[in-house]
C-alpha cells in the first residue's frame, strides 16, 4: 500500500495487539545530572523536587505510570525537528521501545551517535526492502512518511506502531507508543 492509502480504517484493519515485553534502555540522568552539584543524596532530593515543579504536568491519563513511561507524554511544548512518528511543533509525545534488548541497544547507540556526531556529510548505507513505503519509512533524515502514518494511526485510535528498526543490523522490530494508554503496567518491569 502506498502512504496515500493508509487511511485510519485501513490502518485499523491491520492493527494487532502487542505481544509481550518491550525494551528501552534508560539512563540515570536524574541521579547523575544533579548529584555533582550537591554534597549528598539528602541535598539532592530537594533539588530534584524543585526541578520536578518546573516541568510540565503529566497528562491525567498518564499519571498511573512510572515517570520512565510517562515522560515522553508530558512535554507538549513545540518540538523542534520531529522524530520518526512525531511531527515538529506542538503534538502529543511518543514513547519509543523495541521488541528485543539488542534492538533497543541499537536504537540507543544510534541516537547517542547522532547526539555526538558533527559530520553531516558521512555517507549512510543503503538497504532494500520488499514493501513499497518501507524506503520512505526508513529514511534517516526525512520522517514525514512516518509522521503521516502516525497521524492516520491516531485517527484510527491505534496506540502502538510496530516497525522495523533501521538501526539494528538484524532488522528487528521497534515500537512507537502513540499514547500512554498503551502501557499494560504502570511501571517498568
Question: What feature does the model see in each segment?
Answer:
Residues 89, 101, 111-112, 177:
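Generic preference for flexible, low-structure residues
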Residues 99-105:
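Internal, conserved structured core segments that host functional sites
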